[in-house]
Amino acid sequence: MTKNEYLIEKLQVDLANHITELTSAYGEVTIECEVQNLLPVMIELRDREEFSFDELIDLCGVDYLHYGDYDWETESATEHGFSRGVERQEAKAYAVNKPRFAVVYHLLSTKKNHRLRVKLFVEESHLIVPSVHHLWKSANWFEREAYDLYGILFDGHPDLRRLLTDYGFIGHPFRKDFPLSGEVEMRYDAKLQKVIYAPVDIVPRIVVPKVIRNDNRYIGNEGSKND
């Protein structure tokens, strides 16, 4: 029995009432849970001997707003330009029938030498998730980053301030509906002799298509998915 198989077996037995989905792909184990079950799940994963996840190595937000969408209409093909190399496609390559936002945690057990991904989806109308900073100190800045970039609130965080964006920044730049060029630009005004903010004068446009494909490293190697 491999380490992942052992981990999956223990998760199915000990956390069956708290997780909604368990998957294993490309040598990685992922579980999903509801927001209200996050803290009970995380406490079990940290404190139970067979799990012993003593390190939170990453926490991030995800926005699935345009997940699976193509950048161009591809209903017709011509002999010139980008569309000449495009086959007819469906409206979406992939569909996610879940809330728009998710929070993803990556856990590591230095004692058991195994890893786990924990994911929970959050309703856009109620972007509040319990903080886990009291379980892993590394969560402090990770949660601040997710708040700054996605607008996800972490209930119980001791200092939930922006971490990366400028003072007075409006919006959350990693959201898919945030303009790539931003809302305002900062420049030095020679007449006023100070730095000012002004609306951006860049017109957003697509110059490189979004490519949706299966990673060719794993094509024809299905057996490795469940290692």
From Swiss-Prot:
Ribosomal protein recorded as keyword: no
InterPro entries assigned: NADH_DH_suC, NADH_quin_OxRdtase_su_C/D-like, NADH_UbQ_OxRdtase_30kDa_su, NADH_UbQ_OxRdtase_CS
GO CC entries: plasma membrane
Primary location group: membrane
GO MF annotation terms: NADH dehydrogenase (ubiquinone) activity; NADH:ubiquinone reductase (non-electrogenic) activity; quinone binding
Enzyme class: translocase
Gene3D superfamilies: NADH:ubiquinone oxidoreductase, 30kDa subunit (3.30.460.80)
Superkingdom field: Bacteria
Keyword Iron: no
Pfam family, one: Complex1_30kDa
Keyword line: Cell inner membrane, Cell membrane, Membrane, NAD, Quinone, Translocase, Transport, Ubiquinone
Catalytic activity: a quinone + NADH + 5 H(+)(in) = a quinol + NAD(+) + 4 H(+)(out)
SUPFAM superfamilies, per database record: Nqo5-like (SSF143243)
EC number: 7.1.1.-
Localization, UniProt: Cell inner membrane
Topology of the protein relative to the lipid bilayer: Peripheral membrane protein
Subunit structure: NDH-1 is composed of 14 different subunits. Subunits NuoB, C, D, E, F, and G constitute the peripheral sector of the complex.
Purpose: NDH-1 shuttles electrons from NADH, via FMN and iron-sulfur (Fe-S) centers, to quinones in the respiratory chain. The immediate electron acceptor for the enzyme in this species is believed to be ubiquinone. Couples the redox reaction to proton translocation (for every two electrons transferred, four hydrogen ions are translocated across the cytoplasmic membrane), and thus conserves the redox energy in a proton gradient.
PANTHER family from the UniProt entry: NADH DEHYDROGENASE [UBIQUINONE] IRON-SULFUR PROTEIN 3, MITOCHONDRIAL, NADH DEHYDROGENASE UBIQUINONE IRON-SULFUR PROTEIN 3
Family: Belongs to the complex I 30 kDa subunit family.
Protein known as: NADH-quinone oxidoreductase subunit C
Phylogenetic placement of the source organism: Bacteria, Pseudomonadati, Pseudomonadota, Gammaproteobacteria, Legionellales
Gene name linked to the record: nuoC
